[in-house]
């Protein structure tokens, strides 16, 4: 990547886009079904943390989609020339709950664009901050990290990460399936082909199977975190997480956690025992 290319991308820092949405019932009901939860309507229902991803959805027309299924990079998102895109992690700070029926405003801002070099070549890291408000009351601030990378240089995407075993106090096991990923893609109007198109994911992008969405992995973590909060008599304030490697369908994964001198830590072990996601959690009393 040329120096001028990066300088042109940095001109997008500070870009702002605003959205509004009404927190209606169907996405909550459907997400409950996806996670095998019973859903019972009640007035002033609190939307679980992480489920804000079911709202404020982009709706690009078919002719606006790129070869990978993502919307072509124009407008708010910088036109990064690197072809591959992945959700790399983020931070969420929860100030006040989102309630069923609320009218919410979302303000998104390009915070940073950074060039790095990794084992696959050039990487562009894009940081976007999303702030959510009910009228003037701040409810949630999310910092989203997206990584763009070059085309694969071999037939398969490989990682040097080795399986490890850690002590844990909390655990929940999930078995992501193609049906689950299809449902989550539909719920979030996500057309990224690595999540549902097996030939594309394996032959074009070099993955071993279709890839579990980064936000869905974070949702699995939040599911366990909220159970821990109830047991410990605490309230979730923030979650910071990083996706280390892709997670694929075709094997059970373990969400695990522990509280030690450094605080509450959670992680996801993929079906091979590798730490696919690492997270830190802050609770309040």
Residue ranges and their predicted role:
Residues 2-46, 160-217, 224-227:
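A contiguous, surface-exposed recognition patch within enzymatic or periplasmic domains that forms
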Residues 13, 23, 27, 57-60, ...:
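Solvent-exposed, flexible loop/coil residues
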Residues 45, 122, 233-235:
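Short, surface-exposed helix-loop/turn micro-motifs enriched in polar/charged residues
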Residues 79, 130, 134, 210-211:
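Alpha-helix boundary/capping detector
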């Amino acid at each position: 990547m040329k120096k001028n290319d990066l300088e042109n991308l940095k001109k997008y820092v500070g870009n702002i886009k605003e959205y509004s949405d009404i927190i209606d019932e169907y996405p909550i009901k459907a997400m409950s079904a996806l996670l095998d939860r019973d859903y019972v309507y009640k007035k002033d229902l609190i939307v679980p943390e992480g489920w804000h991803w079911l709202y404020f959805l982009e709706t690009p027309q078919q002719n606006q989609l790129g070869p990978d299924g993502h919307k072509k990079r124009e407008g708010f998102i910088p036109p990064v020339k690197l072809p591959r895109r992945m959700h790399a992690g983020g931070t969420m700070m929860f100030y006040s709950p989102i309630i069923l029926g609320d009218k919410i405003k979302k303000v998104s801002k390009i915070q940073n664009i950074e060039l790095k070099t990794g084992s696959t070549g050039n990487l562009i890291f894009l940081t976007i901050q999303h702030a959510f408000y009910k009228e003037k009351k701040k409810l949630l601030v999310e910092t989203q990290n997206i990584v763009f990378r070059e085309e694969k240089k071999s037939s398969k995407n490989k990682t040097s990460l080795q399986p490890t075993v850690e002590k844990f106090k909390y655990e929940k096991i999930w078995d992501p399936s193609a049906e689950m990923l299809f449902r989550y893609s539909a719920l979030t109007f996500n057309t990224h082909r690595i999540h549902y198109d097996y030939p594309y994911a394996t032959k074009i992008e070099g993955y071993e199977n279709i890839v579990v969405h980064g936000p869905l992995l974070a949702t699995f973590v939040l599911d366990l975190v909220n159970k821990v909060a109830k047991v410990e008599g605490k309230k979730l304030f923030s979650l910071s997480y990083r996706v280390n490697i892709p997670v694929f369908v075709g094997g059970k994964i373990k969400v695990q956690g522990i509280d030690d001198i450094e605080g509450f830590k959670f992680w996801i072990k993929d079906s091979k025992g590798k730490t696919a996601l690492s997270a830190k959690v802050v609770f309040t009393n």
